[in-house]
Amino acid sequence: MAFKVKILGAGSIGNHLGHAARVLGWDVDICDMDEAALERTRTDIYPARYGAWDEEIHLFPVEQAPVGDYDMICIGTPPDSHIELALKALEERPRALLVEKPLCGPDLHQAQKLFEMAENCDTQAFVGYDHV
């Protein structure tokens, strides 16, 4: 069975994450609260970057997105939503959680809560920050 990934956010980052996951042969669901963003992903952003839309990627409005049974959940939404969505994503108990930078604002209490919750869920939590 293929590795299953849910990507929250159908903007630039969501498209990059979706393409990278498909290159690895993973099953990909992209979810967004804005149905117009999902349509832009399918008809504009993804095809412009990668040559054509990948019919193996499934698009869902957030309220219709499948819940649970994901190996990984990736969060590529606007920064002010990261920590809230990450905490909610952990309720699905994925094997791994990737949150794009920044994880949270300057108050690190929520970050500590996230890592404690991830540990209790046996989920590996990562922050996407690759500037070295």
Model-derived segments and spans:
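Short acidic low-complexity segments
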Residues: 54-70
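Amphipathic, non-transmembrane alpha-helical secondary structure
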Residues: 15, 19, 35, 39, ...
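Local beta-strand N-terminus motif with an aromatic residue
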Residues: 27, 70-73
